[in-house]
Structure formats: C-alpha cells, structure tokens
From Swiss-Prot:
Substrate-recognition component of the SCF (SKP1-CUL1-F-box protein)-type E3 ubiquitin ligase complex. PROSITE patterns: FBOX (PS50181). The lineage of its organism: Eukaryota, Metazoa, Chordata, Craniata, Vertebrata. Directly interacts with SKP1 and CUL1. It comes from Homo sapiens. This is F-box only protein 36.
C-alpha cells in the first residue's frame, strides 16, 4: 500500500531557537531522515563554516536520541511525533489524497461528521467549507436545480443555499428576480 507514496514524505524548514540564526531543514523520505543545517553568523570565524547534513535510516533515527532532541528543539514536539510515526510506517493516507477525491468522499458523510472533520486540520476545514463540496451535497439531495436556484447559489454560496429553508429560499429567489428584472427594464 505504501508503494504509491511519493519519495519525499515530509519536508520542513526552520530557524534555531534564539539567539541562534542558524537555518535547518528536515526531510523524511521513504527510507531516510535527512537533517541539514546552515550556520548563520556575523562573526568572521564562523563565515567559512560549511553546511552540515546527517542522514539516518528510519530505524537509526528511532534510536538516535540526540537527533530526535535537535528535531524537537528546532521544529517542536508535534513535528518530532509526526516524524517518529512516519519512521514507524504510520502514514496519514487520508491527508495524501487529492482534493477532488476527498470532496467526493466527504460528500457522502453526515452533516455532523462534516462538522467534526472540519475541525481536524486547515486542509479539511477548507475542503468542508468549499462551494464545490456543498454544490455536490445540494445536487445529491435535490431532484432538480433550476437555473434561478443555481444563479442564487453562485451569488450567496452553495453552503448558504443548503442551510436556507424553503420559505426563505423562495423569498430570496423572488427578490433576485425583481432586482435583475428591474435592471433589465432600465437598460435601453
């Protein structure tokens, strides 16, 4: 199942804790953890310092407490936990799916589940609030969508349209027809 994973599983960059200005990169591939650093200093004795790199297999990284400590210090405990899980083979396959595929999957969820999923990450929040998702949900729950309703959804948003009750929807459609009808009459 992991064969369709990209070669680079995770990559992040960061700056060392103050007062250090050193720059760091953490790269996790399918087989290795690569930790790179660049010394940034105004002092002349450090100007000729070359960048460094430490490469460890996943198994070696799990046993290397020094490199884990550096990772936690620079990138934080959450990143360290995530990298450890990647090294143990615990991949987040759901996060790696395309947006279109995720939108199709999410459209089959109950509304309560969509609300919970929206709270899990920035990416899922963006997907759960997207007009594309709510258009799919409206299309699956409604028999037909008239051009007037589609135009109203383009103006107000599909999510807003979904949560609007029928009486309010009829009122909004009437107002929209009057507004655009008056505009057409005024045009020569």
């Amino acid at each position: 199942m992991a064969s369709w994973l990209p070669e680079t599983l995770f990559e992040t960059v960061g700056q060392g804790p103050p007062p250090s200005k050193d720059y760091y990169q953490l790269l996790v591939t399918r087989s290795q953890v690569i930790f790179r650093w660049w010394k940034i200093s105004l002092r002349s004795e450090y100007r000729s310092t070359k960048p460094g790199e430490a490469k460890e297999t996943h198994e070696d990284f799990l046993e290397n407490s020094h490199l884990q400590g550096q990772t936690a210090l620079i990138f934080g405990a959450r990143i360290l936990d995530y990298v450890i899980n990647l090294c143990k083979g615990k991949f987040d396959f759901l996060e790696r799916l395309s947006d279109d595929l995720l939108l199709t999957i999410i459209s089959y969820l109950d509304l309560e589940d969509i609300a919970r999923l929206c709270q899990t990450s920035h990416r899922f929040a963006k997907l759960c609030m997207s007009d594309k998702l709510w258009e799919q949900i409206v299309q699956s729950t409604c028999d037909t969508i008239t051009p007037d309703v589609r135009a109203l959804a383009e103006d107000t948003g599909w999510r807003q349209l979904f949560f609007t009750n029928k009486l309010q929807l009829q009122r909004q459609l009437r107002k929209r027809k009057q507004k655009y009808g008056n505009l057409r009459e005024k045009q020569p």
